[in-house]
């Protein structure tokens, strides 16, 4: 296999401890699969590709993978999606979002970065047209 082909297959994973409170990334995949730390339980995994080259260099990777257990889904992800008018996780695919770090109310959990704005827009504009 050619080196260039191998490079296309592997994307370095960003170090979560180096991510800023907000960043922009394009969602590449959303899948529900078994939680690797708690076999028998499912979690939702969101894979997003960072869009800022300087950030990619500083976090040492271009891909962010966020795991949302059911408690994270209920408290953080679902409310964020509802604010954006998203009714299905499939609607996240292929779109670029601003992600924001949020901490759940329960102890012992790391922050999760949730989508808070689509392409820098937080929702529908309420401005009236000048015409």
Stretch-by-stretch model annotation:
Residues 1-131:
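Short beta-rich binding modules
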